[in-house]
Amino acid sequence: MSDDFGSRNVDFKKLQGGNKMTEKIVQTAGRDALGNFAPNFAHYNDDVLFGDNWNNEDIDLKTRSIITVVALMSQGITDSSLKYHILNAKNHGVTQKEMAAIITHAAFYAGWPKAWATFNLAKEVYSEEPRD
């Protein structure tokens, strides 16, 4: 099984006015990876998690991305899915300085080793951005 499952084929459309979506988020990774083997799981992944949940405008995408990064970090999930969600957070307006503060804050609740692993991924994602 590829560790890229759940971290590809998400089309986060153009944003306007900060984090306001102009089009829906579309996900196909579930169907692409597991459509024939686990069609119900693929449906929940693509249509419910990324379709309904990520398109719910009650929480803006920047906040939703921060929540997702912290949730994955707190579970110790430091594979490509966490890196992907760190990139999404960056794309939704989370600066390097904010990401460092978020990971540092979460470290006290989720654990220091998990923060180290998350910082390593965040450094890769933010490596081309000048420090703010």
Tell me what each language-model feature is:
Residues 1-63, 91, 115-132:
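Acidic, glycine/proline-rich low-complexity segments that act as flexible tails and inter-domain linkers
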Residues 43-46, 76-82:
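Short acidic alpha-helix initiation/capping motifs at coil-to-helix transition points
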Residues 50, 72-75, 104, 108:
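Amphipathic alpha-helical core segments of compact helical bundles
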Residues 63-66, 96-99, 115:
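Short runs of predominantly hydrophobic/aromatic residues within well-ordered alpha helices
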Residues 64-72, 102-103:
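Short, structured motif recognition centered on aromatic/hydrophobic residues
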Residues 75-76, 91:
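Short, solvent-exposed interaction modules
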Residues 82-104, 120, 125:
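A cross-kingdom feature marking solvent-exposed beta-strand/loop segments within repeated
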Residues 106-118:
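C-terminal structural segments of small proteins and small subunits
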